[in-house]
């Protein structure tokens, strides 16, 4: 075998050692990796990382003192809402395998590992008594990341609200959550902030508010009867109330960090937002306005208050008194409440103007736009195994340019970007590892992102999603987002997909 092939298989060899998988297969052809497009073209201080989240990967859901989150309850009470009726009780068992997983991240040549802290692992009831074993676990994870020469990029809230707070006051439907979130953040900053310099308060508040309260497909599973199969909820108001309290929770935690910790810990804090980019369905003025309005509703809903202290005018006009208002004090608290913005980007949709309706209101009628990846039956880009994800890498350039032009060119980290494949246990692992679609997805998005940087967008890092196959929320274990294959049928053994080897080559490891 040639030296170059041996070089390519260093990761596979490591995986064989740390996961006990024996001799790795060597069917990967080196031509897959022959590329002049690599890390060296990006700014010297640019971070390349990979991500995960607590409920998706940790497992160990009811051991070592962790309290239940709303996702534990949701998957238990509504298994019919999960595609394969599963839960994150085991995930990818990161709780017991974090050392070997972090070693793989290092071996790939990445700079940083993004993960989230389970609020109910630290505070089993959301507040009050601290769980020392939970505190110890994250100390161990952070220390292991640093010991491997990696940078921890840590999210405080990735959708797994402690069930106790949902029971006590309906969670983010109540403004009481703001103080509890601030206290949780305070403890985490105090405990880990000597080593963690990149903090994300919230991951995708849009998804939490929309899927949890508009359609009811995410925990806590609330929506109007006309919008989905939910016992309780109001799709016309609750998503906006929840979003408002998420924004205020972020702002409170960010202010706390900046006033109490930042000067001596010398870290940065931000929030991670998610959006599609939107192209007008036609060149008509109405469709151009609809595309702009859709971006306001998906992205500006959070980016506008965090930057300017108020909601986008298009939302105010559409929603009237259904949209909560910020007090003068809240405007000051929220405005400019970040050092950076994280952005999760996967796809771009068309937006076509639609009339505003006053019956059976939902987020999607409020937008006054029909949003779809299809135009006259033709997709905006190649379809994938995930029904909403169509490949459109140009959108990442358009999005970071939009942030530069509309939101004062903030420091940006792409905190998620990736593609899923359907889980198919009937094909051999040697075949399942061949994920050419993922290689081309990352390669093309990075090319458009680099162009965005050259055009002046202040992007400082790119985190692929995700490290390993894991629990994909309402899709359960039916989809694989990882660059590392997890064998759910054989003790969760890890195998590198071709994308992991491509990434290693891209990173000049």
Swiss-Prot record:
Active site (catalytic residues): 204 (proton donor), 416 (nucleophile)
Record's keyword terms, sorted: Disulfide bond, Glycoprotein, Glycosidase, Hydrolase, Signal
Tissue: Expressed at high levels in seeds, at moderate levels in flowers and at low levels in roots, stems and leaves.
Gene Ontology molecular function, alphabetical: hydrolase activity, hydrolyzing O-glycosyl compounds; vicianin beta-glucosidase activity
InterPro entries, A to Z: Glyco_hydro_1, Glyco_hydro_1_AS, Glyco_hydro_1_N_CS, Glycoside_hydrolase_SF
Enzyme Commission designation: 3.2.1.119
Positions contributing to a beta-D-glucoside binding: 56, 158, 203-204, 346, 416, 465, 472-473, 481
Cleaved signal peptide residues: 1-19
Catalytic activity: (R)-vicianin + H2O = vicianose + mandelonitrile
Keyword Repeat applies: no
Disulfide bonds: 223-230
Biological processes per GO annotation: carbohydrate catabolic process
PROSITE patterns per UniProt: GLYCOSYL_HYDROL_F1_1, GLYCOSYL_HYDROL_F1_2
Transmembrane domains' residue ranges: none
The keyword Hydrolase belongs to this UniProt entry's keyword annotation: yes
Residues listed as glycosylation sites in the UniProt record: 38, 360, 424
Summary of the function given for this chain in its UniProt record: Hydrolyzes the disaccharide glycosides vicianin, pNP beta-primeveroside, 2-phenylethyl beta-primeveroside and furcatin.
Family from the record: Belongs to the glycosyl hydrolase 1 family.
Protein name: Vicianin hydrolase
């Amino acid at each position: 075998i040639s030296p170059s092939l041996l070089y390519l298989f260093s990761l596979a060899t490591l995986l064989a050692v740390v996961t006990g998988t024996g001799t790795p297969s060597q069917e990967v052809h080196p031509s897959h990796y022959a590329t002049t497009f690599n890390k060296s073209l990006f700014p010297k201080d640019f971070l390349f990382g990979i991500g995960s989240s607590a409920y998706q990967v940790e497992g160990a859901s009811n051991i070592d003192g962790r309290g239940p989150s709303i996702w534990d309850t949701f998957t238990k009470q509504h298994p019919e809402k999960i595609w394969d009726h599963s839960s994150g009780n085991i995930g990818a068992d990161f709780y017991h395998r974090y050392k070997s997983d972090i070693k793989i991240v290092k071996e790939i040549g990445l700079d940083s590992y993004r993960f989230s802290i389970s609020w109910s692992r630290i505070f089993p009831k959301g507040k009050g008594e601290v769980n020392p074993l939970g505190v110890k676990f994250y100390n161990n994870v952070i220390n292991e990341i640093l010991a491997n020469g990696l940078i921890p990029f840590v999210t405080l809230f990735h959708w797994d609200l402690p069930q106790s707070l949902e029971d006590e006051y309906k969670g983010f439907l109540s403004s009481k959550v703001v103080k509890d979130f601030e206290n949780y953040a305070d403890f985490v900053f105090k405990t880990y902030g000597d080593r963690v310099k990149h903090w994300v308060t919230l991951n995708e508040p849009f998804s939490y508010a929309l899927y949890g309260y508009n359609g009811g497909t995410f925990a806590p599973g609330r929506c109007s009867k006309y919008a989905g199969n939910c016992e309780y909820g109001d799709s016309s108001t609750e998503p906006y109330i929840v979003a408002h309290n998420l924004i205020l929770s972020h702002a409170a935690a960010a202010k706390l960090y900046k006033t109490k910790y930042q000067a001596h810990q010398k870290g940065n804090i931000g929030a991670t937002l998610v959006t599609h980019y939107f192209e007008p369905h036609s060149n008509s003025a109405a469709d151009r306005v609809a595309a702009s309005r859709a971006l306001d509703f998906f992205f500006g809903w959070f980016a506008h208050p965090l930057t300017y202290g108020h909601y986008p005018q298009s939302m105010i006009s559409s929603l009237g008194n259904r949209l909560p208002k910020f007090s003068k004090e809240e405007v000051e608290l929220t405005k400019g409440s970040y050092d950076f913005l994280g952005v999760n980007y996967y796809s771009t949709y068309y937006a076509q103007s639609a009339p505003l309706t006053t019956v059976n209101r939902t987020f999607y009628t409020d937008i006054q736009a029909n949003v779809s990846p299809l135009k006259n039956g033709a997709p905006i880009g190649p379809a994938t195994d995930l029904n909403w994800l169509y490949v459109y890498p140009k959108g990442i350039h358009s999005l970071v340019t939009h942030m530069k032009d509309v939101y004062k060119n903030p420091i940006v980290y792409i905190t998620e970007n990736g593609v899923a494949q359907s889980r198919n246990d009937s094909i051999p692992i040697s075949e399942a590892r061949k994920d050419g679609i993922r290689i081309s997805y990352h390669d093309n998005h990075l090319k458009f992102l680099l162009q965005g940087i050259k055009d002046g967008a202040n992007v400082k890092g790119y985190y692929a999603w995700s490290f390993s196959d894991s629990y994909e929320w309402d899709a359960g274990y039916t989809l694989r987002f990882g660059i590392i294959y997890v064998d759910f049928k054989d003790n969760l053994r890890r195998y590198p997909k071709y994308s992991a080897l491509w990434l290693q080559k891209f990173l000049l490891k």
